[in-house]
A protein has these predicted regions:
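N-terminal targeting leaders
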Residues: 1-37, 42-47, 51-227
């Protein structure tokens, strides 16, 4: 299996979507039946307009006592116009939030992981231009850590020793156990030892790297990989 380094490799392409006219009840059905936490709202042309989340739909129940005049102590006197709008909404166009967190198919997995953690969101919608082409969630990124040790070893051999460092395969060895890579053997230059560790750690699914490599010459060789 080739290294999956971009969103396009791991995203879910078959996305459950709603239209602006989708009813409240149908939205609830989508979330409950399909076991998703949010439904994107798209135009007839496929452009992403907004998203309806579980929290948006719960607004109706959360403020039911206020609507009935029961004086619910948790919400009475604290309702905003936005609260009332969502509590009374009957279609996706009035329920949805327009503030969206998005990415592109070409974004790298580390970039997406940073967006998810920084913004505290569960998912990012994937856009090609303005069109929705997929969704990437936290679990999609975590799934890369389920790659087998043998798959990871082959990936490290190829991307680190063959493609990047052009090392003699008789002088280097990568072994993997529970996602942790052990690098042993000898490279030509000191700088290549650090490069091997950095590149191995960048392979999707690698949990950690133990570097036990040696070198022949100090310093940086003429073909040392930069960056």
């Amino acid at each position: 299996m080739r290294t999956s380094t971009t969103v396009g490799h791991v995203m879910t392409r078959e996305v459950i979507t709603a239209t602006p006219a989708t009813s409240f009840k149908d939205l609830v059905g989508m979330i409950v039946t399909d076991r998703v936490s949010a439904v994107p709202v798209v135009s007839p042309e496929g452009s992403l307009l907004g998203v309806v989340t579980e929290a948006d739909l719960l607004c109706r129940q959360a403020h039911q006592d206020d609507a009935l005049g029961a004086g619910c102590p948790h919400f009475a006197g604290h309702l905003t116009r936005e609260d009332w709008r969502k509590a009374a909404a009957q279609t996706a166009t009035t329920l949805m939030s327009a503030a969206l967190h998005t990415t592109t198919p070409g974004a790298t997995l580390p970039e997406v992981a940073r967006l998810l953690t920084t913004n505290g969101v569960r998912r990012l919608f994937v856009l090609d231009g303005e069109h929705l082409v997929g969704v990437v969630a936290r679990r999609d990124l975590l799934r890369t850590f389920l790659r087998t040790d043998e798959d990871l070893r082959a990936d490290v051999d190829r991307t680190v020793f063959e493609d990047a460092l052009h090392a003699d395969k008789n002088n280097v060895l990568a072994t993997v156990e529970h996602g942790v890579v052990l690098l042993t053997g000898r490279l030509e230059y000191e700088a290549d030892v650090a490069t091997a560790e950095r590149l191995a750690l960048a392979v999707p699914g690698v949990v950690g790297v133990r570097n036990r490599m040696d070198f022949v010459w100090q310093g940086q060789g003429p073909q040392h990989v930069a960056g």
